[in-house]
Regions:
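Short, glycine- and small/hydrophobic-rich beta-strand elements in well-ordered beta-sheets
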Residues: 30-51, 55-59, 137-166
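Surface-exposed beta-loop interaction hotspot
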Residues: 92-116
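An amphipathic, aromatic/His-enriched active-site/gating alpha helix that lines ligand/cofactor pockets
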Residues: 32-39, 56-90, 143, 163-206
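Short amphipathic alpha-helical segments
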Residues: 14-38, 121-145
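C-terminal edge-of-domain segments
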Residues: 97-106, 204-215
């Protein structure tokens, strides 16, 4: 399975226009997704940021005819946004812990987050997360987190995580202390747009909202 991500910044006051225009092309768009074998497609919004995620069986799944449709839709929707990631190009994968991916999503909740990197901190962010991958020694994570990936473009970081609610539990004191230590250390290289660590910092950020989803 191949994973893909993209991101845009909404122009001031244009989020409603973006939603309305997306609704007008939604049926045609999902038909192209289905024909191209693209699944688990979703777009998320926090503040003026749009983050999209989807999956396919291979990297090159959209033929030239369908790609032309996407370019035309991009022009139609693009009155409302500017690209953060490079259009139609892979976004940089900063971290992954795919674990055991649940094919059945009925008991999945999502954690999707957005942060802004301190200028010049992208490689340090990658280094810290590479260390987490190495520490797993190839062990497959059973859950509750699954299909977890973190991406970066334009100085932003975007996280996508599928959480198996049947395996969730209250944090132990050790887990809580470890999480607080990690997140406080990360604050020296990034700031949050979503509300994931408000319980640690005492700040108040917006909760991310799913704009659309296609299975």
């Amino acid at each position: 399975m191949k994973r893909h991500a993209f991101a845009m910044k909404v122009k001031e006051g244009m989020l409603g226009e973006y939603r309305a225009r997306l609704g007008k092309i939604w049926t045609e768009l999902t038909e192209v997704l289905d024909m191209s074998g693209i699944s688990n497609f979703s777009i998320w919004n926090v503040e003026d940021i749009l983050f999209g995620y989807c999956e396919s069986l291979s990297d090159n799944v959209i033929d030239e005819e369908e790609m032309e449709k996407l370019r035309n839709w991009d022009k139609f929707l693009g009155v409302a946004y500017e690209w953060i990631s490079e259009p139609y190009k892979p976004m940089r994968l900063m971290y992954h812990d795919f674990g055991w991916v649940r094919e059945n999503k009925e008991m999945i909740r999502h954690r999707v987050f957005v942060t802004k990197l301190v200028p010049g901190s992208e490689e340090e962010y990658k280094r810290r997360h590479d260390a987490l991958v190495e520490a797993r020694n190839g062990e497959v994570t059973a859950g509750p987190d699954s299909n977890f990936s973190i991406w970066s473009a334009g100085g932003y970081v975007f996280g996508y995580d599928e959480i198996d609610t049947s395996m969730e539990h209250a944090m132990t004191e050790e887990e809580r202390e470890s999480s607080i230590k990690w997140e406080k250390n990360m604050l020296n290289i990034m700031s949050w747009l979503t509300d994931d660590v408000d319980w640690i910092t005492g700040e108040h950020h917006s909760h991310i909202v799913r704009v659309c989803y296609h299975e």
